[in-house]
A protein has these predicted regions:
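Cysteine-dependent hydrolase recognition
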Residues: 1-168
């Protein structure tokens, strides 16, 4: 069980990590910043590590190759340093608030396919729905929290639900 968290929220996931360990999971808590400091996965370390998201994906691929199947939980949202990849959605398919980029974690769950990422004129790396694979290699979840309090609330609710499923 891998938890990827921004450095400033690492201490806030300790209770969640301990709970998962009590449930029998082997848990690794890794910060985004530590991945990016690693000589093997820092941006520019190789052709596959060209931005934060690609470096985190390469780290996940390495963990998967060396550890086998696991689950990845990202902690953080747009207010944090948590990585996110976006799809370039044609405006004729959807026009939600005129945004043509839709966030997705499919990039991090599909560790086998070669994603055709292109940098658009605004400097955003994106992928069209036609060049991406939607076949997950690992399950990926995301806890949309940006503060210690939000993480603690979620963790308390999760523990209560998992201890007493009918009452959560």
């Amino acid at each position: 069980y891998v938890i990827i968290v921004p450095d400033n929220l690492k201490d806030a996931v300790e209770k969640l990590s301990n709970w998962k360990k009590q449930k029998g999971y082997s848990v690794i808590v890794q910060t985004v910043e530590d991945i990016l400091k690693s000589s093997k996965f820092k941006i520019g370390a190789n052709q596959n590590c060209f931005d934060k998201e690609s470096s985190v994906r390469e780290w996940l691929k390495d963990r998967y190759k060396n550890s086998g199947a696991f689950f990845c939980l990202f902690i953080g949202d747009y207010r944090t340093s948590a990585p996110i990849r976006k799809f370039n959605i044609s405006s004729r398919l959807t026009d939600v608030n005129s945004h043509k980029y839709t966030p997705t974690d499919a990039y991090f769950s599909d560790l086998i396919s070669q994603w055709d990422l292109q940098k658009d004129p605004s400097g955003i790396y994106s992928c069209s729905v036609y060049s991406a694979s939607f076949s997950p290699t690992i399950p990926v979840g995301r806890l949309l929290c940006a503060s210690r309090e939000e993480i603690e609330r979620y963790t308390n609710k999760l523990i209560l639900y998992e201890m007493f499923p009918g009452r959560g």
